[in-house]
């Protein structure tokens, strides 16, 4: 079971909750345990503020992932963490990169969920493993390879790990 808390902190149009559930469930299907996660959809000012606070970057990025650092045994449902998605950045990127908006949304949600599961793209081997899984999952949805034309977008999602 997936418990999804979808928070809308922007009035910009976004995919339906059913779409978010489908994309998350696909990315998390390798996980046998129940899972809880939050997706917060934000505008550019909030996206910029969070990116500045956590990464010292003064711009809004498309997706930030915040993996939970709470032992599963302390929770009724294992908390995976939070994704923060800047709607305006997602829309702009899709347009600039000539990508179908729904496909770009699906990619970024899947990419963020994989970060919450511990996948990363710090080195080439990790990146290849993560990207291959993303490509496979997106193909199941009928979406094209998101990395086919634009290597610069390969590693757009940032994982924030609490250093405390």
Swiss-Prot record:
Gene3D superfamilies given for it? Metalloproteases ('zincins'), catalytic domain
Q: Name one Pfam family in it.
A: YbeY
Q: Which cofactor does it need?
A: Zn(2+)
- InterPro entries per the record? MetalPrtase_cat_dom_sf_prd, YbeY, YbeY_CS
Its annotated compartments are:
Cytoplasm
Q: Does the keyword Nuclease apply?
A: yes
Bias-annotated ranges (Polar residues): 155-164
Q: Please list the residues that bind Zn(2+).
A: 111, 115, 121
Q: Name one GO cellular component term.
A: cytoplasm
Give the region (Disordered) as residue ranges.
140-164
Please give the SUPFAM superfamilies that the UniProt record associates with this protein: Metalloproteases ('zincins'), catalytic domain (SSF55486)
Write the Enzyme Commission number(s) for this entry: 3.1.-.-
Main location class: cytoplasm
Q: Which domain of life is it from?
A: Bacteria
Entry cofactor note text?
Answer: Binds 1 zinc ion.
Keywords (A to Z) from UniProt: Cytoplasm, Endonuclease, Hydrolase, Metal-binding, Nuclease, Ribosome biogenesis, rRNA processing, Zinc
Q: Which GO terms describe its biological process?
A: rRNA processing
The record's HAMAP family line, in alphabetical order, gives:
Endoribonucl_YbeY
Similarity comment: family membership = Belongs to the endoribonuclease YbeY family.
Task of the protein: Single strand-specific metallo-endoribonuclease involved in late-stage 70S ribosome quality control and in maturation of the 3' terminus of the 16S rRNA.
This protein is called Endoribonuclease YbeY
| Annotated source species | Pseudomonas fluorescens (strain SBW25)
Q: What is the lineage of its organism?
A: Bacteria, Pseudomonadati, Pseudomonadota, Gammaproteobacteria, Pseudomonadales
